[in-house]
Amino acid sequence: MGPIRARTVVAGVALAVVASLGWTTPAGAVDAAARCAALAGVDIPARVIGLPTTGGEVTDAALVAPSGSGTSAIGEHCEVTAALHPVDPAAPDIRLQVALPTTWNQKALMFGGGGYNGTIPALDGNVPFGPSDAPRPLGRGYATFASDSGHQAPAGFLPTASLYGEFLANDEALRNFSGDALKKTRDAAVFVIDRYYDREEPEQTYFAGGSTGGREALAVAQRWERDFDGVISVYPAFNAATLDLYFGHMTRQLAAPGAFPRPAQQVLLYNAVITACDGLDGLTDGVISNEPACDFDPAVLRCPEGQDAGDACLSDPQITAIRAVSSAVTFPYPLASGETGYPGFPFLSGADMSTPLLGLGTTAPADPMPKTAGYGMQFWDAWVEYAVTRDPGFDSLSLDPLAPGPWEDRISELTALQDVNDTDLRPFAGRGGKLLLLHGTADELVSHRATVEYYEGMVQTMGQRKVDAFARFYLVPGANHANLAAAFAAGWDSLTALDRWVTTGAAPADPVVRDTNPGATRTRPLCEYPAHPRYDGTGSPDDAASFDCGTG
């Protein structure tokens, strides 16, 4: 849960005072420490949760003292930890936390997770692609909440807790991860909020998440349109099982003899792509703004005779693999979710294979899967072993996602469960819900091209006018997955924009995104898809005012 914060010691006498007053006492009439302590041990009835559980309880409640200053300031709040129990006694609990500000703005925000989840996101964190020059949600007075989606990664799991996938072997845990935990967490959190603030529910409730959390943001808009007033979905892995299949395709391509580009060769490729395409947008700034116009041919880096001759060139097997993982794949069998393929990654138009952890890694995929292999390859390995075959000893390299044989039906079944791809959001829009959808064009883990396909599917299903009435889609040139060592680390106050749209009806107008890399001062217009920033050729290249949005 991030840095350890000072906690106010709550005297037992305060707990007794609140217990004697009962739950009808106005929230402001009792000391915050006592009100907070009184939550400990409170039952969360199964009847208040919209999906099956066996109920739960608050396991801990402690008042957290104010901390930080300026935009990093976090006010006093009650931090509540709770557990929701499964129907299947073999399934793990859902563990969740809720932060309840003493000075509350009457609004709530749920954070999404990442990867396979397994930990609770920091309640004092920021929204994905959030601003560095504005307070975080909890610092603004939002009640914030999040969960581990129904399983707990072991402490110290390597290379990161978000790659722990053993829980997938349990059906209820799998359903929770696939979306059910979102509803259960939301209902339990609102129950706690209502209890703490004396029967007062939030006036607005929002959801913000990236990657798996971006999928979760779209899931709540698609499945529980009455529960959230607005969602921020960033680099969403919405078609999760289909993406897993593409990870499998990548894994097999890169495991071929001599196919894996070493880290120095990954950097070689990235630098060559930037050199070739950076100026296509009229400005040489390390960012490829006109990404669709870039189609780099890795053959220009070919080693003599196509043989591996060191890190200054690429062999024929490496060129073949790089082209394969940069290209679309169509699956030659039907998937129950309706997905038909995956569009590939922009490694030949600006994405960096060498991004730490999230890129291709430093070691070729193998069986058993190395902890130094790429994130997507380890993700595939866990999915095959625990969700598909449910055999921890299964060699994931032996399963061909283009010809899965006896596993075809199981894979199709998983796509129906995990792909969150309903493009008809009229129920959500019809009750006033708003959607902000963002993706970086240099994403090395979840392709922005897939998000483009989802958005275009929305337009095809609903019509452009209806989509424009409730949704905005922005592509951010140079931004990658989670702003990790990105050419352009995107920062935009999407929460203020979303809240204004929901509460006043004013849609985002001429938004500006800031590069939040250390020492960076540049800004760019945040252009609605399909436009991208275009430099005017005269103004400061660090000022968004020197750019317009266009498609040429």
Residues covered by each model-derived region:
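Catalytic-loop region of hydrolases
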Residues: 28-107, 119-126, 130-132, 283-288, ...
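Short beta-strand/loop motif that positions the catalytic acidic residue
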Residues: 436-439
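Histidine-bearing beta->alpha loop at or near hydrolase active sites
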Residues: 470-485, 517-519
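Glycine-rich nucleophile elbow surrounding the catalytic serine of serine-hydrolase chemistry
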Residues: 209-219
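Cap/lid segment of the alpha/beta-hydrolase catalytic domain
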Residues: 114-202, 245, 393-417, 475-480, ...
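Secretory targeting and sorting signals
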Residues: 1-29
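Alpha/beta-hydrolase fold nucleophile elbow
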Residues: 199-211
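A catalytic-pocket lid/entrance helix-loop region that shapes and gates access to the active site
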Residues: 219-221, 226-330, 490
